[in-house]
UniProtKB/Swiss-Prot annotation:
It catalyses: 2 D-sedoheptulose 7-phosphate = D-glycero-alpha-D-manno-heptose 7-phosphate + D-glycero-beta-D-manno-heptose 7-phosphate. The reaction produces a racemic mixture of D-glycero-alpha-D-manno-heptose 7-phosphate and D-glycero-beta-D-manno-heptose 7-phosphate. This is Phosphoheptose isomerase. It comes from the Bacteria. Pfam families: SIS_2. SUPFAM superfamilies: SIS domain. Binds 1 zinc ion per subunit. Residues 41-197 form the SIS domain. Pathway: Carbohydrate biosynthesis; D-glycero-D-manno-heptose 7-phosphate biosynthesis; D-glycero-alpha-D-manno-heptose 7-phosphate and D-glycero-beta-D-manno-heptose 7-phosphate from sedoheptulose 7-phosphate: step 1/1. Belongs to the SIS family. GmhA subfamily. GO terms for cellular component: cytoplasm.
Amino acid sequence: MNSPSDSFTRWVIDEIEASIDVKRRTIETQAPMIVAIAERVVETFRRGGKLLLCGNGGSAADAQHIAAEFVSRFRRERHGLPAIALTTDTSILTAISNDYGYERVFARQVEALGRPGDMVIGISTSGISASVIAAMRAARNGGMATVGFTGASGGTLVDHVDLCLCVPSHNTARIQEVHITVAHVVCEIVERTLFEE
């Protein structure tokens, strides 16, 4: 007779194998896009620009994680790179949400903090987050590069960005796992390019 731990062991194996499968499919379909995103980030930093990142829920946490890798470091000892997660200042978030509605929570910050030559990275597993799409519109209007991290076919986000990583899955957890893996790969390419020249 199987014990509860046996069924959990099988479940753990299935979940990790599912994550590996989505990563494998991402490699097959998105590797050139990942390189293109990394090259655009390098270009942004070389020209004196900064990254602004946004997302909701788990994607907000990913925005903060990615910003931390650039500002602190990823693997190499080097000077910090300018990256700001637009998800962290509760006074700003609540003021904008209260005065303008939540849909404008990131767009208003992009308008205030962004400059031509900067890049805005919007993270939305569904590709239909109104607040992220509004931020991308504000970025384009302000002369900034735009990158989306999303899932499946990209939702409507894909229509509002210059480059879009579309993880081939509809499972939110799997998409988020790939997003942070890709972000680490992008950080590695940026560090190798800017600090090993």
